[in-house]
């Protein structure tokens, strides 16, 4: 089951997550959101412990929707290291979602360090100078 989060939870659940995050923006009136949510629920079980899955009601959380340029529903925004790294608009087939998730995990494994926001150096660069 995917946790539904609000603006209050967004920072802790998405931006501070140690795992990559699959954030699915939906609305009750959106007919294509239902099959997307069904597929996302199945993928959440498959990727448990590797990717965090959250659902965000786009109508109730307009500030987040605007900040992350959610212009269509459903919209899926993939986050890594607190940054949006991919955006999928509209209904997505299971194979397309799985491909995006596998790419996200592969990129995570091949990354060479995360940027330190103050000086632009990676954590690896900083450890070399100690």
Residue ranges and their predicted role:
Residues 4-6, 25, 40-44, 48-63:
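Thiol-based oxidoreductase modules, predominantly thioredoxin-like and allied folds used
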């Amino acid at each position: 089951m995917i946790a539904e989060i609000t603006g209050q939870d967004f920072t802790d659940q998405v931006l501070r997550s140690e795992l990559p995050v699959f954030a699915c923006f939906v609305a009750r009136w959106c007919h294509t959101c239902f099959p997307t949510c069904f597929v996302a629920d199945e993928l959440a079980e498959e990727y448990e412990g590797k990717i965090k899955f959250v659902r965000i009601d786009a109508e109730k959380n307009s500030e987040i929707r605007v900040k992350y340029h959610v212009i269509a529903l459903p919209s899926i925004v993939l986050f890594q290291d607190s940054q949006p790294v991919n955006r999928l608009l509209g209904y997505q087939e299971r194979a397309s979602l799985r491909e995006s998730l596998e790419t996200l995990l592969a990129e995570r494994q091949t990354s060479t360090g995360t940027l330190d926001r103050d000086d632009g150096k990676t954590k690896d660069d900083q450890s070399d100078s100690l």
